[in-house]
Amino acid sequence: MIYIDASNHIYGRLSSYVAKKLLNGESITIVNASKVVITGRKEFIIDKFNNLRNTGSIRKGPYYPKTADRILKRSIGDMLPKKKTHGMEALKRCMVYANVPKSLENKNFERIESAMNKKVTGFITLGEISKILGETYE
């Protein structure tokens, strides 16, 4: 079981790292998903997520999530082979939390150095995006 503190990690790099580990058969728990950063200009990133949410219709998908933990889990799932059983089983081994739950406060969390946001100044967090998209709880 791997525990990852996702604060100040880059969205895509973290997702691809976790997807590879899941396909290798490991179980992963990610906390602080609301503190994951997406690099780029805020206006373009917000427009991208708004356009994703507005595609399709109410009755037919695709359905895109509003909350930070579900946005991150969907991006990890998009990197897995969903139509194969090992891809579906891999996604079941991944747990994502927006903050640190009380049951996991005493665990030792890893930080992935290859996915850290070190010098990039233009970014927005998943927590900010989810508030803009209309997340109703925290």
Swiss-Prot record:
GO cellular component: cytosolic large ribosomal subunit
Assigned keywords, A-Z: Ribonucleoprotein, Ribosomal protein
Annotated InterPro entries: Ribosomal_uL13 (IPR005822), Ribosomal_uL13_bac-type (IPR005823), Ribosomal_uL13_euk/arc (IPR005755), Ribosomal_uL13_sf (IPR036899)
Top-rank lineage group of the source organism: Archaea
Pfam families, A to Z: Ribosomal_L13
GO molecular function: mRNA binding; structural constituent of ribosome
Entry function: This protein is one of the early assembly proteins of the 50S ribosomal subunit, although it is not seen to bind rRNA by itself. It is important during the early stages of 50S assembly.
GO terms under biological process: negative regulation of translation; translation
The protein's assembly and partners: Part of the 50S ribosomal subunit.
Family: Belongs to the universal ribosomal protein uL13 family.
The keyword Ribonucleoprotein is annotated on this UniProt entry: yes
Protein name, entry field: Large ribosomal subunit protein uL13
